[in-house]
């Protein structure tokens, strides 16, 4: 996936959490998150049942994260930077969103990722369908 940031294109290899169980787990217990690795919660909420404000926490998450909240038009609504490991304090999107990306804490600032930047990705099902139709 790519974020068109002010500092240039930022590329991430992100897993996809698209079920309720996967989204509840998130990056809990992960200690080895690489610089350009992340987890995309898409659709958010699972099943795509309408937009809603997102609220995350860092329970059981030993690594600081940047949590990027993404609008339906794929622009960034908010970047919650350097979240506190293990915190149970809610981290809110501030507005309804359709996807959320978690990356290693501090990366958004390093790469110049900010509100309004455009996020682009191919949903796994769409990539598979395109390969089947094209092949």
PLM regions and their residue ranges:
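Compact, glycine-rich, soluble single-domain proteins
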Residues: 1-135
